[in-house]
């Protein structure tokens, strides 16, 4: 992460520094009372820029901007309703995956254009919800193993679902996108469409392809998509440059795409 990117992330955190206190005040009100609802609405209103920021990251994918903003705001409302201040976690960290999950659900319901079985679509949706819940409890993005334990399923199934989701928008990591080059952001998981995995049908097809990748490419791919690491973190773990990580990711996805075509 560049110094400017770090500064951008810090400014975003400071932007919502008053939100934790707003939630503490909410807890002191009678649940379900008019005062409680008004105060929660105030929190939602306060965080609308967060939802709108996420919605803008998904522009240019065939959905009207106003629709994306509306869907993202619904996700924000859901996050405010579900957030448990007693966990001690940060609301923004919880809200981001919740909002993103709502937007992704919108795309799944309205514009999923690749050949992914319904079972995998539903699995990816469950993973989105579980990711939001675990992120709140853990204070960080969960690993594939933690998601598997949460959902009571095999880790291979979780990996399959994560890759199925990547089939319609491979996630970019260290770039905030657009002209705002200090917007790494709120999250490292927004990115552009990559059709490289659009013919994933089942794990029997995917597993041998992953195993056939060179060890370093497979390692980088697993760290990125299954362990939720950024390119910078992967570079530090593997001992190579961030640019090299980026090239390896592109190369490994290209290999998978060629094999799946």
Swiss-Prot record:
Signals that turn on the gene: Constitutively expressed at a low level under all conditions tested, including stationary phase and several stresses. 3-fold induced during starvation. Positively controls expression of its own operon (rsbW-sigF).
Question: Where is region (Sigma-70 factor domain-4) located?
Answer: 209-258
Pfam family of the protein (one): Sigma70_r4
Among the GO biological process terms of this entry, one is: regulation of DNA-templated transcription
What Gene3D superfamilies does the record tag this protein with? Answer: 1.20.120.1810, Winged helix-like DNA-binding domain superfamily/Winged helix DNA-binding domain
Motif Interaction with polymerase core subunit RpoC, residue numbers = 67-70
* Renumbered residue ranges of the record's region Sigma-70 factor domain-3: 123-189
GO function terms (MF aspect): DNA binding; RNA polymerase core enzyme binding; sigma factor activity
- Name the DNA-binding stretches: 231-250
Q: Which family does it belong to?
A: Belongs to the sigma-70 factor family.
Q: What is recorded about the domains?
A: The sigma-70 factor domain-2 mediates sequence-specific interaction with the -10 element in promoter DNA, and plays an important role in melting the double-stranded DNA and the formation of the transcription bubble. The sigma-70 factor domain-2 mediates interaction with the RNA polymerase subunits RpoB and RpoC. The sigma-70 factor domain-4 contains a helix-turn-helix (H-T-H) motif that mediates interaction with the -35 element in promoter DNA. The domain also mediates interaction with the RNA polymerase subunit RpoA. Interactions between sigma-70 factor domain-4 and anti-sigma factors prevents interaction of sigma factors with the RNA polymerase catalytic core.
Question: What interactions and quaternary structure are annotated?
Answer: Monomer. Interacts transiently with the RNA polymerase catalytic core formed by RpoA, RpoB, RpoC and RpoZ (2 alpha, 1 beta, 1 beta' and 1 omega subunit) to form the RNA polymerase holoenzyme that can initiate transcription. Interacts (via sigma-70 factor domain 4) with anti-sigma-F factor RsbW (UsfX) with a possible 2:1 RbsW:SigF stoichiometry, which inhibits SigF activity.
Please describe what this protein does: Sigma factors are initiation factors that promote the attachment of RNA polymerase to specific initiation sites and are then released. Held in an inactive form by a cognate anti-sigma factor RsbW (UsfX) until released. Increased expression decreases growth rate, and after 3 days increases the expression of 51 loci encoding 33 protein-coding genes as well as some non-coding RNA.
Quote the protein name from its UniProt record.
RNA polymerase sigma factor SigF
